[in-house]
From Swiss-Prot:
Keywords recorded for this protein, A-Z: Elongation factor, Mitochondrion, Phosphoprotein, Protein biosynthesis, Transit peptide
Name of the molecule in the record: Elongation factor Ts, mitochondrial
Residues modified as Phosphoserine: S283
GO biological process, alphabetically ordered: mitochondrial translational elongation; regulation of mitochondrial translation
Its biological purpose: Associates with the EF-Tu.GDP complex and induces the exchange of GDP to GTP. It remains bound to the aminoacyl-tRNA.EF-Tu.GTP complex up to the GTP hydrolysis stage on the ribosome.
Predominant place of localization: mitochondrion
Molecular function as annotated in GO: translation elongation factor activity
Record: transit peptide: 1-55
Compartments (UniProt record): Mitochondrion
Pfam families: EF-Ts_N, EF_TS
Gene Ontology CC annotations of this record: mitochondrial matrix
N6-succinyllysine modifications at: K89, K146, K205
Keyword set includes Phosphoprotein: yes
Gene symbol of the encoding locus: TSFM
Amino acid sequence: MSLLRSLRLCLVARTGSCPLSALGPGPLLPSLQAGLPLLQSPQQWHTFHSGSWLSSASSKELLMKLRRKTGYSFINCKKALETCGGDLKQAESWLHKQAQKEGWSKAARLHGRKTKEGLIGLLQEGDTTVLVEVNCETDFVSRNLKFQQLVQQVALGTLLHCQNLKDQLSTYSKGFLNSSELSELPAGPEREGSLKDQLALAIGKLGENMILKRAAWVKVPAGFYVGSYVHGAMHSPSLHNLVLGKYGALVICETSELKANLADLGRRLGQHVVGMAPLSVGSLDDEPGGEAETKMLSQPYLLDPSITLGQYVQPHGVSVVDFVRFECGEGEDAADAE
């Protein structure tokens, strides 16, 4: 075959058609004699290989909807829809299961790495208040929205756990959950599995070791009030009454009547607990100095050191009965020293 004829045949292969006369003399392939292109167009090839469910606008909308809802990549969302025959609910479940597998695998590889950073989360609803701590490796990840959503899920899980405790209160109740207990709590009505499954998902997405460190909860009846404070506070983007930060405190007060300024008073008491780190409440009769320096009521008041906290509280007609203080990452330095 001549060079010119070969080049003409290549031209046919690229364009899909050409006048038969342009090929010059000589025998032609049967497909060319019938006037058919040698190759299908690129668009036809793409449609054939992409799966029939992607050929309609509604299917592409499904892909976009799954992407927006889950946050996973287009490639993974497309694979999920293909695997599940275009069923959106099944595709979402499939994605979460795959991500969980990857997360558990990554968690096993990262286990043991130090988690000194993270966030404290404080959530109040009705007569219930919870304080949680979730740790990660770097401050950079603690500022990531996905990590903050994990803290939110842990706070909500703890709140639901506390609200499900059917006890008749004559006084306040307070409880703590360690890492293991916290991990086993249900993830919530809109989430599958437990909080440890949500932890695995977050580890898979963010690539750092993380732990659900601890939680505290307080329930109060009438006649009690819980003051709260979070240092460096920022509000959750999707849950207005969840506050995030590096330090958090709850202060339980008993009061004979509901006062208009209780919220401000509770915040100031929480600030004192965060700043002065008392170890116990103490009493109004404690003398300042010595061991009393660790007792809340005999400590110099944080915002006015000329008086004790007890002297500040007394005119307001409330009694401080208990408190909880969380500092993000506390205990890690001591563990390193050991």
